[in-house]
Amino acid sequence: YWPEYSCNGKEDTKVSDLLCHRAAMFGFKEGIPLGSFQDWNKFIQQLQLQTPYRKPGISQGYHALTFGWLVGELIRRVDGRSVGQYFKEEIAEPLNIDFHIGLDEIDLIRCADMLMIERDSMQLPGQFLRYVPSFLLPQRLKNFKTALLSGDFLEAFQEREEEDANYVNSLDWRKAEIPSANGHGTAKSLARLYGILSNGCARDEISIMSEASLQYAITPHSSGPDSVLFGAPIKFGLGYELAQGISTVGNISPTLNNKMFGHAG
C-alpha cells in the first residue's frame, strides 16, 4: 500500500502492527515538523523516512499522535481520499453524525475552546522507581520502571518547541486532519456512532462495516505491557482500545468478560 514506508528498518511492518500500536513509530525522532498542521505530506514524509524506535511487531507502544498520520495515510493510499473526507462521505453524512476530522469554515463558530495544561505542571508519576532495584519490585512495577527509563512516553507525547500550549484552539489546528488528536464533535454524535457499532453496525439500511469485520477488529491483537503508557497491560484490537475484564467484588469474585471497545482517552 505504501512503498515509500518500506525502508530504514520498517520493511517488515504489517498493517496490523500500525493498527494495534506495534509499529515502533510512536514519535517523531527529529521533532514534530514545524509549519502548518494542514500540510499532511510534511508529516508523512518525515515518518516514512524515519527509523523505528525498535523492531516493528515486537512490542507495544501507544502511538498517541503518529497513529493518525500512519493509519490515515494507509486509508489515503487504498481509497484515494483523505481520512477526514472518507469519514465525512462514508459515515458522518449518511448516518447524520455530527463529528468531523478537520473542521469546515462553517463549523468553526460552534467549536469550544480547550484549556491545556502547561508541560511544566505535568509531573511524571513514580519517578522514585528509578532508584529502586528491579528485583525488589512486583512485575507490574518492573514494567512501569522499564517504560519510565525508556523515555517512550516523552517521545510519544512530545510538543513542538516554544509552542503555546493552547495551539489546539488555533484555526490551523482545527482545520487540519489529525485523526488521532483533533476530531471535533458532540457527545451525542459519539453516542450515536458507537450505538450503531454496538447494534449490528448498520442503521437506516446504511452499514459502517460487517458485524464479522467488527468482531475481528475488537478481538485482542496486542496486550502490552505498553512501553509508552508506563508498562500498563492495555489491550488493543485493530484500531480500538479494548476494556479489561471486570470483577464485581474487588479481586475475590470471578473476572467477567468485558466487551467494551473504543478508547479511554
What are these regions (language model features)?
Residues Y5-K10, L229-G231:
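Acidic pyrophosphate-coordinating catalytic loop
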Residues L18, Q46-L47, A217, Y240:
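A generic structural signal for nonpolar/aromatic side chains embedded in well-ordered alpha-helices
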Residues R76, Y194-E205:
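Non-catalytic, well-ordered alpha-helical segments in soluble enzyme domains
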Residues A202-Q215, L229-G231:
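Short acidic alpha-helical/loop segments enriched in Asp/Glu that coordinate divalent cations
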Residues E118-A187, Y216-G265:
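Active-site Gly/Thr loop motif
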Residues H21-R22, Q50, I196-G200, P220:
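Generic structural signal for alpha-helix termini and adjacent loop/cap motifs
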Residues T186-S189, G195:
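Glycine-rich, aromatic-lined ligand/substrate-binding cores of catalytic
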Residues P3, K10-T13, C20-A112, Y167, ...:
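Catalytic-site signature segments of enzymes, centered on catalytic residues
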